């Protein structure tokens, strides 16, 4: 295990995933464990919000920090929910409600287009110093009603391009091999270690 890296999250459940995706090269501690406040996400892009959160955690902790911002963008909804993906689930993080909202908004459009994409932006920032930012994306199609109980968020309504199963139906290892987050982490590892 290497140097400490702050995961700019208050969700300790993310630590094992982050550690695994970074091949165990860092000792991961969360912003929540350090008592750091969460910044307001005021940027208009996934990259902007990831960078804001990473810089905030790095500057307050004095340690390098990793942050992510991710979400679902729907072509027929002009990219919505986008950076507001989690907010569409409301304060209770009810993604059944969020998926219903996506379906209702699509029904209000005149479009039959059900294409969508997941984006994950990752940023690593050093205290008062440089930062590395990468983005991963996976394209697909939305299906209603949702299918499957695996994963989280919008996974039950998203079928990745070239596949028949939703992320919610896939074995976790299959989803993880192609997800937007895995693609972003592959780019991040290349930027940091190659």
Swiss-Prot record:
List its EC numbers: 3.6.1.66
Chain sites annotated for binding Mg(2+): 40, 69
Q: Which UniProt keywords apply?
A: Hydrolase, Magnesium, Metal-binding, Nucleotide metabolism, Nucleotide-binding
Q: Which GO terms label this protein's molecular function in UniProt? A: dITP diphosphatase activity; ITP diphosphatase activity; metal ion binding; nucleotide binding; ribonucleoside triphosphate phosphatase activity; XTP diphosphatase activity
- Which reaction is recorded as catalysed by this protein? XTP + H2O = XMP + diphosphate + H(+); dITP + H2O = dIMP + diphosphate + H(+); ITP + H2O = IMP + diphosphate + H(+)
Q: Which residues cross the membrane?
A: none
Q: Where does substrate bind?
A: 9-14, 70, 152-155, 175, 180-181
Question: What's the short name of a Pfam family annotated to this entry?
Answer: Ham1p_like
| Residue numbers annotated as active site | 69 (proton acceptor)
State the HAMAP family in the record: Non_canon_purine_NTPase (MF_01405)
> To which protein family does this belong?
Belongs to the HAM1 NTPase family.
Q: What is this protein called?
A: dITP/XTP pyrophosphatase
